[in-house]
């Protein structure tokens, strides 16, 4: 496949990967921890931080247009092969586990239409019927992407537009129903009994996750029609997502008082729609949630398959995963990715285990490459503007790692350790097997040793 992804397709890929299931629960999530004043401050800080990260990606695509797949290649080029591999491995692993959760959420949302007190068909998305349905959806998307990334991206563009319809309807109705006295009631959150700055921190513990996927266009940059579109698509998608999040959370506080909104069950947007337009509102949001998550799942499947392909081309993953089919789709890495997702689905059903801890740890691994984006720009920047953006992106990246929980970052060595063994095997599969550097050997040794106590802490 030739480089055919235009600005619209790239923007949709990024926006769709960010707008998943979370936006439909944001009203309650935010109202539970923060007042309108804290929300305005929290979104302001988050907005500046994510825009700095998006600008860092934009500048890197202009300064180093030769580097495809950003998240992996920026880390490799700036900080060595081992750091590059860990960035790719952590990103891919997070994408796999996130895709499992998307499939579970889809069928949990479908239970709104199929389940009743007498019949539990899909339940919370972990019944055997839900797992069978999720498996069918998994392999339908698999063969869709095998037809070519351009085909999948075109469908994703349509899905992104479709998911914006219920969100747009919600915003319009919320503007009409907005009542300023309701919004300003207890504006600083006295009833919460928490200082405003503590409320701000609590909002940012939520907002740090809603922009995961911002790197989508950079990951598939090798397939862009024009490299300049990559950075612009990232910036446009961030601005669009930030606008949606701001409108959804702030307008909701003018429809219902914060204490009442905080008690709603999720997806809270459905309850608000019922209040504004009757029982059909819940149906619209449930359908919108399903379309939204399916679109996000398609985006993440494309991105998850692209990373092993690029890593194999740079000799960080086994040579096998550099294979592409006649349509230039990353066939080998797609099989690896979706086979891993399928195994996880079966394990969830068979064990009935809660994988939320694993999802949290893996999600933290995706934040490390965000910091490395800023660090790489700082390393190669010459102009004062570029350096200033790089410093800001680094600070925001460090904040993300701190706010999401340093302990989870430490526990992530449990997932990095098998990756290191995979890295050592991968090097043997390539003709040019370059010897490890001394410091790389030390880091590998430390990771393997640290994995033992980390595993004990995780299972105890």
What are these regions (language model features)?
Residues 1-2, 40, 44, 117-129, ...:
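Helix-loop-helix junctions that connect adjacent transmembrane segments
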Residues 384-460:
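A generic transmembrane alpha-helix motif of multi-pass inner-membrane proteins
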Residues 76, 103-132, 166, 223-227, ...:
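Helix-loop-helix connectors at the membrane interface of multi-pass transporters/channels
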Residues 72-75, 80, 112-117, 203, ...:
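TM-loop-TM module centered on a large, flexible mid-protein loop between adjacent transmembrane helices
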Residues 1-28, 32-33, 37-40, 50-58, ...:
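Membrane-interface "cap" regions at the ends of multi-pass membrane proteins
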Residues 31, 42, 51-138, 142-146, ...:
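Hydrophobic transmembrane alpha-helices that form the core helical bundles
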Residues 31-35, 39-40, 114-127, 150-160, ...:
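Transmembrane helix-loop boundary segments of multi-pass membrane transporters
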Residues 110, 129-180, 234-238, 363-369, ...:
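Membrane-interface loop-to-helix entry segments
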């Amino acid at each position: 496949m030739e480089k055919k992804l235009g600005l619209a397709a790239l923007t949709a890929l990024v926006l769709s990967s960010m707008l998943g299931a979370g936006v439909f629960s944001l009203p309650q999530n935010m109202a539970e921890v923060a007042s309108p004043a804290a929300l305005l401050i929290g979104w302001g800080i988050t907005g500046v931080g994510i825009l700095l990260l998006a600008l860092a990606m934009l500048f890197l695509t202009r300064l180093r247009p030769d580097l495809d797949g950003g998240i992996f290649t920026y880390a490799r080029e700036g900080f060595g092969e081992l750091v590059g591999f860990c960035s790719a491995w952590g990103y891919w692993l997070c994408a796999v586990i996130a895709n499992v959760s998307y499939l579970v959420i889809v069928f949990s949302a479908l239970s709104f239409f199929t389940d009743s007190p007498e019949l539990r068909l899909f339940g919370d998305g972990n019944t055997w019927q839900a797992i069978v349905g999720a498996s069918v959806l998994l392999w339908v998307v698999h063969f869709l992407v095998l037809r070519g990334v351009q085909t999948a991206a075109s469908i994703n563009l349509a899905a992104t537009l479709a998911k914006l319809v219920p969100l747009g309807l919600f915003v319009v109705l919320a503007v009409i129903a907005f009542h300023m006295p309701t919004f300003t009631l207890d504006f600083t959150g006295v009833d919460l009994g928490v200082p405003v700055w503590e409320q701000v921190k609590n909002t940012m513990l939520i907002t740090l996750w809603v922009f995961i996927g911002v790197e989508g266009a950079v990951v598939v940059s090798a397939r862009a029609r024009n490299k300049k579109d990559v950075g612009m698509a990232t910036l446009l998608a961030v601005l669009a997502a930030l606008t949606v999040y701001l409108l959804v959370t702030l307008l909701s506080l003018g429809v219902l008082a914060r204490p009442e909104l905080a008690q709603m069950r999720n997806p809270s947007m459905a309850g608000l729609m019922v209040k504004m337009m009757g029982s059909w509102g819940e149906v619209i949001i449930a359908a919108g949630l399903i379309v939204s998550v399916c679109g996000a799942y398609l985006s993440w499947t494309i991105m998850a398959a692209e990373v092993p392909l690029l890593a194999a081309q740079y000799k960080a993953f086994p040579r096998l995963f550099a294979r592409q089919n006649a349509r230039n789709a990353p066939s080998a890495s797609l099989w690896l990715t979706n086979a891993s997702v399928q195994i996880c689905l079966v394990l969830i059903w068979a064990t009935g285990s809660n994988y939320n801890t694993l999802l949290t740890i893996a999600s933290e691994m995706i934040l490390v490459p965000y910091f490395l984006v800023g660090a790489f720009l700082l390393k190669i920047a010459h102009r004062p503007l570029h350096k200033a953006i790089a410093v800001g992106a680094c600070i925001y990246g460090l904040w993300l790692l701190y706010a999401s929980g340093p302990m989870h970052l430490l526990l992530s060595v449990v997932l990095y350790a098998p990756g290191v063994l995979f890295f050592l095997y991968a090097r043997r599969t390539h003709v040019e097997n370059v010897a490890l550097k001394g410091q790389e050997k030390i880091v590998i040794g430390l990771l393997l040793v640290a994995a033992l106590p980390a595993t004990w802490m995780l299972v105890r």
